[in-house]
Amino acid sequence: MSFEINWQDLGEDEAVNDSIKSFLNSHLQSISLPSYVSSLQVTDFCLGGIPPNITLREISDPLDEFYNHIEKEELPKDKIPEESDSGCQSADGENGDLLPEVQAESDLQFLVEVDYKGDMRIGVSAELALNYPSPSFMTLPVKLSITDLGIHALCLVAYISKQLFVSFLCDVADPILDARESLIDLGSSAILGKKSLERISLIRSIKIDSEIGEQNNVEGSVLRSVGKLEQFLLEVFRTILKKEAAWPSWINLDFNEDPSGNESSDED
């Protein structure tokens, strides 16, 4: 079974694009930049008009972890059970799950296969710092365009009490993306290379094009720094997506009357 998504409306929604741009910038501000970069900011984000292909693989009851998350959100802070030395949650000295007393009939969980090779675009601005003969001796503006994002993975989508949970589980074999994962473009763009030994990479393919300011005065050391910046961005965006959306983390969308916004939860 396949799904059709009105992706065009999402891609043209400025609020959605601005929200994702703000989300990415908040993460960029929280990371330590390498010495050759003095600033880094997402200046533009467009979801694009090409939707992912989504195939339904299984329908089941939602996982206990999602119910536990909802109950912990609803409990007062002084009532949240502490974790025992073994890592399991306990209440009144006993281990146990925080399952709801009543599970609604409308609660559902879908295991879906997500295949995305769309036209999403991310614009990034940065300043390369030349640290010789002194730190930040000179800075050079750089504009980067991120395109050709490729994802093919299994994903859990759970609906509980007007809340939506989305978590990616593992990569799926893909002839196109598997071929791209073994490539590195040494020209003006970079392709994410080296197959990950982990169960999930999520971002299997990504391309970055760079535009350097004052190109007539560019030195070899600057060009090398641009290449390092491109590779740094590849790892940053892959890490952000894995940290926020790959199991045991998830994206939580609350559609109740008093929504708390987009949240992600880490469950160790």
UniProtKB/Swiss-Prot annotation:
Residues 75-94 are annotated as: Disordered. It comes from the Eukaryota. The keyword Transmembrane does not apply. One of its GO terms (biological process) is phospholipid transport. One of its GO terms (cellular component) is endoplasmic reticulum membrane. Disulfide bonds: none annotated. Residues 1-256 form the SMP-LTD domain. CDD domains: SMP_Mdm12. It is a peripheral membrane protein. Pfam families: MMM1 (PF10296). Keywords: Endoplasmic reticulum, Lipid transport, Lipid-binding, Membrane, Mitochondrion, Mitochondrion outer membrane, Transport. GO terms for molecular function: lipid binding. It is found in: Mitochondrion outer membrane; Endoplasmic reticulum membrane. The SMP-LTD domain is a barrel-like domain that can bind various types of glycerophospholipids in its interior and mediate their transfer between two adjacent bilayers. Component of the ER-mitochondria encounter structure (ERMES) or MDM complex, composed of MMM1, MDM10, MDM12 and MDM34. A MMM1 homodimer associates with one molecule of MDM12 on each side in a pairwise head-to-tail manner, and the SMP-LTD domains of MMM1 and MDM12 generate a continuous hydrophobic tunnel for phospholipid trafficking. PANTHER family: MITOCHONDRIAL DISTRIBUTION AND MORPHOLOGY PROTEIN 12. Belongs to the MDM12 family. Component of the ERMES/MDM complex, which serves as a molecular tether to connect the endoplasmic reticulum (ER) and mitochondria. Components of this complex are involved in the control of mitochondrial shape and protein biogenesis, and function in nonvesicular lipid trafficking between the ER and mitochondria. MDM12 is required for the interaction of the ER-resident membrane protein MMM1 and the outer mitochondrial membrane-resident beta-barrel protein MDM10. This is Mitochondrial distribution and morphology protein 12. It comes from Lachancea thermotolerans (strain ATCC 56472 / CBS 6340 / NRRL Y-8284) (Yeast). The gene is MDM12.
